[in-house]
Amino acid sequence: MAKKKDTPGDGEFPGFSDTLQRTPKLEKPHYAGHRDRLKQRFRDAPDALADYELLELLLFRAIRRADTKPIAKALLNRFGSIAEVLTAPENLIAEIPGAGPTVALELKLVEAIAKRSARSTVMEREVLGSWDKVINYCTAAMAFETREQFRILFLDKKNKLIADEVQQTGTVDHTPVYPREVVKRALELSATAIILVHNHPSGDPTPSRADIDMTKQLVNAAKALNITVHDHVIIGKHGHASLRSLRLI
């Protein structure tokens, strides 16, 4: 008669089989179900999600195995809004506990895509008839910059946007502008008209005396070479000012 072969739990490892049977299955982390539910809520009604929930969703790709809600809330507490989170300096984003360089890179990628998307709505198009799109683009590109930027939109004879360039970047409250350089660049691009744009990091788009004086100098320099300055727009965090609309040029 063949001898029964011992198995673990039949003498050599008493109770081993029972232990295996009693070992509970590993449960999913608490955030796993939350992620699925949040994704479904986004599919059903994206506008119903709070800002921190949208950030949570965005962080899922960068943070695979952790709860992203505390990080999303920490980002908003630190920077103030989704727009300010996306435009915050990469090194400051990385300092948020749980974020690090991977999250910082992910957020800067989204910022770059958003800016390029807005830019595509105005490039090589007649901009004077699409003024809202121009303002939306400039707001996306400049409203939350921490330093002043002086941007020039160069137009051809049909008022189509042929180039968009940041000519100068200054401090928190000043950007040096050189009319001769602006006109020179317009001639190089064969532009017949330009729109001047700069931001106020303070958030208030009200033109200063220096803004008005500089604009008049630029208008005169451009006029001498048959280049039209259509407007000078100042971008704030929650609005803009048009020197043309204010009858300051």
UniProtKB/Swiss-Prot annotation:
SUPFAM superfamilies: JAB1/MPN domain, RuvA domain 2-like. Transmembrane segments: none annotated. Zn(2+) binds at residues 198, 200, 211. Keywords: Hydrolase, Metal-binding, Metalloprotease, Protease, Zinc. One of its GO terms (biological process) is proteolysis. InterPro entries: MPN, RadC_JAB, RuvA_2-like, UPF0758, UPF0758_CS. Residues 24-34 have a biased composition (Basic and acidic residues). It holds the Pfam family RadC. A motif (JAMM motif) lies at residues 198-211. One of its GO terms (molecular function) is metallopeptidase activity. Residues 1-34 are annotated as: Disordered. Residues 127-249 form the MPN domain. The keyword DNA-binding does not apply. CDD domains: MPN_DUF2466. It comes from the Bacteria. PANTHER family: DNA REPAIR PROTEIN RADC, UPF0758 PROTEIN YEES-RELATED. NCBIfam families: PRK00024.1 (NF000642), radc (TIGR00608). Belongs to the UPF0758 family. This is UPF0758 protein BMEA_A1330. It comes from Brucella melitensis biotype 2 (strain ATCC 23457).
